[in-house]
Amino acid sequence: MDDEDMSCTSGDDYAGYGDEDYYNEADVDAADDVAVTPTHSEEADYECLSVNQVERVFIDGVNSLVSRISINEKFARILLQANHWDVDKIARLVRNDRNDFLRKCHIDAKPEPKRKLSSTQSVLAKGYCSVCAMDGYTELPHLTCGHCFCEHCWKSHVESRLSEGVASRIECMESECEVYAPSEFVLSIIKNSPVIKLKYERFLLRDMVNSHPHLKFCVGNECPVIIRSTEVKPKRVTCMQCHTSFCVKCGADYHAPTSCETIKQWMTKCADDSETANYISAHTKDCPQCHSCIEKAGGCNHIQCTRCRHHFCWMCFGDWKSHGSEYYECSRYKENPSVAAEANHVKARRALEKYLHYFERFENHSKSLKMEEELRDKIRKKIDDKVNEHNGTWIDWQYLHKSVSLLTKCRYTLQYTYPFAYFLSATPRKNLFEYQQAQLEKEVEELAWAVERADGTARGALEAHMHRAEHKRQTLLHDFFF
């Protein structure tokens, strides 16, 4: 695709692109006539840009700053990156104390006490590189700080910093000097090394995009598109090239009603705890008498705690002596008795149980979304068959396609209510949220039941299910997300 043709806006038609996206809003836009009209948009106002188009965005930002303050373009980029491309903020800080601000942004060096050099030292200083200890150079590259080093040492320094992933913050080699090298300076040093130059430009683009609040790399696999949004909010964008959808603020999967900070905590916790939690949940229980954690080694349900010697049933936690005759086929369930002062390991078990409660439901809805993709394919085939049999047109049966798309949308939102609820403090607000969550879950499952039995469900009844589910979803998002 040509760079000039890559630009698109969020108003473009994405219909049909969302086959692998569980939350493709475009798929259900046409269902709005049977659902609730949202008062807030979950879709960001954005456009998809190529690298060349993004470079023009950077140039416009530099020109805007240069027109406001008297500064060289190469330093304007450093200022903009350090201040998240906020031209007004930079202009204000420059007016307050220009010299101090430029030092804080690593453009000017901190004042150094002047040292008196001997005549021999003065001669050497003019052509001497203190890194390689070679002299005789007629010209030594240097930054605004004036510290001179030979081109070979500069190149080695640039390569070293690039190997560490640093591009826009390559500093002077002088000890304790914090002046940054502008991109023009670095490119002049590595101009004869195309491989290093390519790596530097790639890393520099990464740093520039990451510093810009309205730019975000598409998270699709090896996708070159860069998204530019008009607002920095956790809203959904869809790449026009690879059709990947994600949150434009944090780059994660779209996660309403959960915030970016909360979903990051949740995903970290899942990555750290899930395998351990699953094993502990499946293989261990607490002794009902001393609350020690016990791992069951065999198939027998008669357990003796090694700590307190208490005999109990693995299945129901009942005292083994009074358990009855059906020792090995116990079907009773009894919760652990509450204790006034829980030991640390008991508190850990309670925390684990809480985590598993939310994690299992989060995962269950994720699995349901995958299975409902198969349902989507079946409904598409069903519609095609009916149309081919001259039993109505695609428009006549489109409501079936809309129903599964809306089901997907509602279940996706429901899935992300569980991380939100996990981190929510026990307050009246949480009670309200859990009530609305339960209402949404009820409507989602009723809609799923109706969609799976679409042949036996009248169109009016199915559309009523769709309306109720979307109404509950919008109400929850309005109260806890927008």
Curated annotation (Swiss-Prot):
Record: residues binding Zn(2+) 4: 247, 250, 255, 260
Annotated residues for binding of Zn(2+) 6: 313, 316, 323, 330
GO cellular component, one term: nucleus
Catalytic activity: [E2 ubiquitin-conjugating enzyme]-S-ubiquitinyl-L-cysteine + [acceptor protein]-L-lysine = [E2 ubiquitin-conjugating enzyme]-L-cysteine + [acceptor protein]-N(6)-ubiquitinyl-L-lysine
GO biological process, one term: ubiquitin-dependent protein catabolic process
Domain of life (superkingdom): Eukaryota
Ranges in coiled-coil conformation: 433-459
SUPFAM superfamilies for this protein: RING/U-box
Any one GO MF annotation of this record: ubiquitin protein ligase activity
Paired cysteines (S-S): none
Region (TRIAD supradomain): 125-334
Subcellular localization, as worded in the UniProt entry: Nucleus
Residues that coordinate or bind Zn(2+) 2: 145, 147, 172, 177
Active site: 300
Family of the protein in this entry: Belongs to the RBR family. Ariadne subfamily.
Comment on protein domains: Members of the RBR family are atypical E3 ligases. They interact with the E2 conjugating enzyme UBE2L3 and function like HECT-type E3 enzymes: they bind E2s via the first RING-type zinc finger, but require an obligate trans-thiolation step during the ubiquitin transfer, requiring a conserved active site Cys residue in the second RING-type zinc finger. The active site probably forms a thioester intermediate with ubiquitin taken from the active-site cysteine of the E2 before ultimately transferring it to a Lys residue on the substrate.
Described function: Might act as an E3 ubiquitin-protein ligase, or as part of E3 complex, which accepts ubiquitin from specific E2 ubiquitin-conjugating enzymes, such as UBC-2/UBE2L3, and then transfers it to substrates.
Protein name, as recorded: Potential E3 ubiquitin-protein ligase ariadne-2
Organism: Caenorhabditis elegans
Gene it is expressed from: ari-2
